[in-house]
Amino acid sequence: MIISSLTNPNFKVGLPKVIAEVCDYLNTLDLNALENGRHDINDQIYMNVMEPETAEPSSKKAELHHEYLDVQVLIRGTENIEVGATYPNLSKYEDYNEADDYQLCADIDDKFTVTMKPKMFAVFYPYEPHKPCCVVNGKTEKIKKLVVKVPVKLI
């Protein structure tokens, strides 16, 4: 997992080249003006823009991926993301959805929480469990975010 901000002048230091290029591309866009839905960045990388309502972590499922990295960027609002600090016990997870590259689980072992603010991004590698769109300070809110899907083979 990597956490930084698109406004940090040194955000690219240490990032895999393809992730740095994705972030450079995002910095050319008016993120607030992006319409919800899928946007292809190229023939292998795409992003989903969404405006979900945050919710209590207990009402949400954690997710992890096998073939894609997530680059989650908060555009508007605040959200907590619960993150697993250790390799997940996959026996606790639902069956893998190969078509959409995810596995779900009710909760995350050995978790910590990251509070996201606008222009921050978090990179989740395969098998890194995360539970996005959780409330901050117990207050639900409608947020706007995007999730870039990068095939792990490009890293």
Swiss-Prot record:
Q: Which SUPFAM superfamilies does this entry report, sorted A to Z?
A: Clavaminate synthase-like
What UniProt keywords are attached to this protein's entry? Answer: Copper, Cytoplasm, Metal-binding, Zinc
| Any Pfam family the entry gives | DUF386
Q: Which InterPro entries match?
A: NanQ, NanQ/TabA/YiaL, NanQ/TabA/YiaL_sf
Q: Where in the cell is it found?
A: Cytoplasm
Single GO molecular function = metal ion binding
Per the annotation, which location comes first and is thus the protein's main one?
Answer: cytoplasm
The Gene Ontology CC terms held by the record are: cytosol
Cofactor(s) demanded: Zn(2+)
What chemistry does it catalyse, as a reaction equation? N-acetyl-alpha-neuraminate = aceneuramate; N-acetyl-beta-neuraminate = aceneuramate
Q: Which residues bind Cu cation?
A: H65, D70, H130
The superkingdom of the source organism is Bacteria
Cofactor binding annotation: Has been crystallized with Cu(2+) but reconstitutes with Zn(2+).
Q: What function does the entry list?
A: Opens both the alpha- and beta-forms of N-acetylneuraminate (sialic acid; Neu5Ac) to provide aceneuramate, the preferred substrate for NanA. Has preferential activity on the beta-anomer rather than the alpha-anomer. Accelerates a reaction that is spontaneous at slightly alkaline pH, facilitates the reaction at acidic pH.
Protein family according to the UniProt entry: Belongs to the NanQ anomerase family.
Under what name is this protein listed? N-acetylneuraminate anomerase
- Give me the gene this protein comes from: nanQ
